[in-house]
């Protein structure tokens, strides 16, 4: 049984009405933007939030941080997970937490929230989506949640699995 959902480390943050409204389905890759968390800190000068349309037919509500070097970087789920400490230092998805905090700090200034609050909001939105699929699999196969262990694969496994396991009370 395979089910697909557009949530991963590169999933971009959607901002509407001055707050996080969604995560994904567009990714940094689709938008052709670097992840904030995989960017050198020295590139994060004078950060300002801009809202873009990753593809021509998308709405302009995906957050990027535009910097003094003329480049802009996507705010991503990987950035949020790194800031919150869910990604181990030696993991493929581990990045530059300082850069991510600078980028998310620009969003915090715009929204009147804190960096940690915003990261948790983004993770909660994304994991609610993933959690619904896990709940459906549990129901479809009549599984005992106490016997389940979540296992992730790919570069985004540590971005998704630890937070999802914690949120759902399932081992990982």
Whereabouts are the PLM-identified features?
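N-terminally biased helix-coil "hinge/interface" segments that flank
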Residues: 1-172
